[in-house]
């Protein structure tokens, strides 16, 4: 499954009302109303929400995604896929 087949879109629409939202899903290149993280060329993120834990994302977390996070970034892991990892400011359901 990808983010289009989950409640992720509802969450993104809600957050997009007051915040700048970027998405990343290895199976989705374009999503109307949102910018793909691949287009991101600015400063770092205040928060990250992992809603669909693709193997590719988890495998590349340190190398590809961690450099995009601010020092005190909050990392929300909706499904708790990374509970066993040591992640600063980690939050899960």
Please report, for each region that a protein language model flagged, where it lies by residue.
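Structural/interface elements that position substrates and couple domains in central-metabolism enzymes
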Residues: 1-93
């Amino acid at each position: 499954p990808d983010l289009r087949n989950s409640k992720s879109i509802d969450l993104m629409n809600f957050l997009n009302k007051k915040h700048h939202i970027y998405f990343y899903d290895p199976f989705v290149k374009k999503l109307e109303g949102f910018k793909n993280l691949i287009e991101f060329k600015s400063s770092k993120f205040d928060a990250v929400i992992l809603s669909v834990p693709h193997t590719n994302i988890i495998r590349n977390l340190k190398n590809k995604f961690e450099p995009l996070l601010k020092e005190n970034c909050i990392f929300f892991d909706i499904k708790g896929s990374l509970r066993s990892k040591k992640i600063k400011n980690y939050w899960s359901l």
